[in-house]
Amino acid sequence: MARLVAVCRDGEEEFPFERRQIPLYIDDTLTMVMEFPDNVLNLDGHQNNGAQLKQFIQRHGMLKQQDLSIAMVVTSREVLSALSQLVPCVGCRRSVERLFSQLVESGNPALEPLTVGPKGVLSVTRSCMTDAKKLYTLFYVHGSKLNDMIDAIPKSKKNKRCQLHSLDTHKPKPLGGCWMDVWELMSQECRDEVVLIDSSCLLETLETYLRKHRFCTDCKNKVLRAYNILIGELDCSKEKGYCAALYEGLRCCPHERHIHVCCETDFIAHLLGRAEPEFAGGRRERHAKTIDIAQEEVLTCLGIHLYERLHRIWQKLRAEEQTWQMLFYLGVDALRKSFEMTVEKVQGISRLEQLCEEFSEEERVRELKQEKKRQKRKNRRKNKCVCDIPTPLQTADEKEVSQEKETDFIENSSCKACGSTEDGNTCVEVIVTNENTSCTCPSSGNLLGSPKIKKGLSPHCNGSDCGYSSSMEGSETGSREGSDVACTEGICNHDEHGDDSCVHHCEDKEDDGDSCVECWANSEENDTKGKNKKKKKKSKILKCDEHIQKLGSCITDPGNRETSGNTMHTVFHRDKTKDTHPESCCSSEKGGQPLPWFEHRKNVPQFAEPTETLFGPDSGKGAKSLVELLDESECTSDEEIFISQDEIQSFMANNQSFYSNREQYRQHLKEKFNKYCRLNDHKRPICSGWLTTAGAN
């Protein structure tokens, strides 16, 4: 608590106030100096939170000296605006405004380490501004006490005034420990000044006391004579019944009309004890028949006057201390907000924006989970009814195998529609997604995980898939050989390489111009194994081309197909290990089984688009498809055993559109594969795994 350290005898304008000292106005004749001790605002002796202090030091270091100086200045409007919002007591608000105005005029360092400028601006001392630890203690240790202090002040429910500014506090109350508290907080100089009683003030208290208790004329005259003896106007030796012991400890100054009271604590307590019945409301007979009784009444009035004075000092001290604390904490809070706003401007984002961003992120994650659940339920309902009706050509054993594969969502039966006698090799795979449609050509293997595809890949192949990878890395550029979607589109080269379909090493996937260009360059290295092998490959290509051309004649009558509402997904897959004969496909027409591959490619654009649409409109005039380019790369002359670098560069220069649209091709294949996986999520474990991986990415 603040202490009373001095008395302003010549006026407060001439007194040299030190730091944290303010004048305390008691009455017209008394003004004391009020001082706040250093331990109230100790900036070095607190144990701070290490993590918060480290963060504050980092934020403090972000600001330049100029920015820090600007941040550590607030105007009086900001302080008084916060005052009107936080403090409900009108007496407290007026006291804070009065004290702030006094400090602006006088310039006293009453709020150190805060300073008040002549223009009404509030700032911090230079030593505290440059020391991050002191500034942190000021902002987050002392500054955090503002709301607690305001909430701790008792307030009236009627007018929201605090007890110190309520009208009831001006009335003297029964004696308690308040006078002792304020007596202990006074210096010796202040005590001597308090017990110096002005005779005119004592006479006013005495007259009020006589009127209140309605003394008779004789008794009133006796009391007044005892008062005149005390102030030295009458000679005590001439008064009969005068007791000098009653006035012991009292000394008068007739010329200055002062009464000096002994400032010993015991004597003050005894003197105030005489006035206690008056404040307690006790009734006693008020008579002064003799002069000694009149002396006791004078001592009672002296005790009343002294108690009222001490009570007034205690009230002023408490009110001014509360006013000083409010102004100090309001200034610290305003400076802290200014500092944080400056730091937020430097950082570019505020704490409120961070909080909103966190809420938005949580909402986004929640919506994503709900969308995944809805999509999962939608796919489950869409693929709920799946049936596989066996053809008449299937045997009883094959029907059992087909039912088992339907349960596991994998079909591995041989292709009877094509008339092929080779187990595990199929020409046409039809996937029926409607329960009313029948499979015209049972699948012989899983499209993605079939052993035929795995068998066809060379041991040196990296499993590239034209920029689309089902692995977590997803960084491999691919060849059409590893892509089942390319098989669906009819642009794969499975039939072009036979047993060695992946004849090159796709090592630098993303760094190369295109993996297929390197395929064409490296595919010639295998020509050194012999000319006979190359001739065989060439004959295979010719047979495959004839096979594709003859497939148009194998299309069955549209009347044999199911209704237009049924959706059929057909995957055309060529044999990679054995020669494919055109007659094998056409035999299905003789057997009575329809082969609607060509017509289905026209009716289902999402799974079978022409090769030209895959490459987009930017492929350029005269640009060849990948199938034709691959055919040309295989159908080289017997004498040519390698491709020179000039030819490679020439090819890359002539096919710039392919490289410019490379990302479009990848995205197109990725979308196709996603559609395929969504439709076959219940059948293919790899499809569900890919959808989970793609959703996470």
Curated annotation (Swiss-Prot):
<dbReference type="GO" id="GO:0031410">
    <property type="term" value="C:cytoplasmic vesicle"/>
</dbReference>
<keyword id="KW-0597">Phosphoprotein</keyword>
<feature type="modified residue" description="Phosphoserine">
    <location>
        <position position="360"/>
    </location>
</feature>
<dbReference type="GO" id="GO:0010629">
    <property type="term" value="P:negative regulation of gene expression"/>
</dbReference>
<dbReference type="InterPro" id="IPR026073">
    <property type="entry name" value="GGNBP2"/>
</dbReference>
<dbReference type="GO" id="GO:1904893">
    <property type="term" value="P:negative regulation of receptor signaling pathway via STAT"/>
</dbReference>
<comment type="subunit">
    <text>Interacts with GGN.</text>
</comment>
<keyword id="KW-0217">Developmental protein</keyword>
<dbReference type="GO" id="GO:0005634">
    <property type="term" value="C:nucleus"/>
</dbReference>
<dbReference type="GO" id="GO:0005737">
    <property type="term" value="C:cytoplasm"/>
</dbReference>
<protein>
    <recommendedName>
        <fullName>Gametogenetin-binding protein 2</fullName>
    </recommendedName>
</protein>
<keyword id="KW-0744">Spermatogenesis</keyword>
<comment type="function">
    <text>May be involved in spermatogenesis.</text>
</comment>
<dbReference type="GO" id="GO:0060716">
    <property type="term" value="P:labyrinthine layer blood vessel development"/>
</dbReference>
<keyword id="KW-0221">Differentiation</keyword>
<dbReference type="GO" id="GO:0007283">
    <property type="term" value="P:spermatogenesis"/>
</dbReference>
<dbReference type="GO" id="GO:0030154">
    <property type="term" value="P:cell differentiation"/>
</dbReference>
<dbReference type="GO" id="GO:0008285">
    <property type="term" value="P:negative regulation of cell population proliferation"/>
</dbReference>
<keyword id="KW-0968">Cytoplasmic vesicle</keyword>
